[in-house]
């Protein structure tokens, strides 16, 4: 059975989703309110995680352990390293990496997560296709791109760092 977890770091990022869902239960875990219900006849759990990778990871683990979600959508605002993206455009993640992971002193590549043997985390192809189709159907005037998402607990403003990440 498909059950989708929808995460937003800030209330502003999830309030619209919550307003369209039929909520059957609200469960509080680790200070976060998980809204369980349906959205367009699909089982969903919507939650505001708080800002940062640690909060997102904690939230994701609760979604997996307590709610047994099969898929996760992380929604919200973000900065852009891509000059072709404007405010209001949509970027669908083809892959993701931690831009501030650095254990090169132990022989790993920049961004590589120890003992995982990789630094990129690939998106599910079916979810990519469905997300792009949904975006185009709902609002065909908004630019939609598929590309890399990088995550880090810092803001990147240095041009050389930006170029390395994209």
Where are the model-predicted features located?
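Short, conserved "active-site rim" segments that organize catalytic pockets and cofactor/ligand binding
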Residues: 2-21
């Amino acid at each position: 059975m498909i059950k989708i977890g929808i995460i937003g770091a800030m209330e502003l990022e999830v309030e619209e989703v919550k307003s369209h869902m039929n909520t059957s239960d609200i469960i509080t875990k680790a200070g976060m309110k998980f809204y369980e219900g349906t959205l367009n006849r699909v089982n969903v759990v919507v939650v505001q995680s708080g800002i940062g990778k640690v909060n997102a990871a904690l939230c994701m683990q609760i979604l997996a352990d307590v709610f047994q979600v099969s898929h996760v959508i992380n929604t919200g605002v973000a900065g852009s390293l891509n000059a072709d993206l404007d405010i209001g455009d949509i970027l669908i993640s083809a892959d993701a990496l931690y831009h501030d992971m650095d254990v090169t002193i132990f022989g790993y590549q920049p961004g590589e997560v120890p003992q995982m043997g990789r630094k990129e985390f690939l998106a599910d192809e079916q979810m990519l296709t469905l997300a792009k189709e949904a975006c185009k159907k709902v609002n065909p005037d908004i630019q939609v791109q598929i590309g890399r998402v990088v995550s880090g607990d810092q803001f990147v403003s240095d041009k050389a760092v930006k170029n390395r990440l994209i």
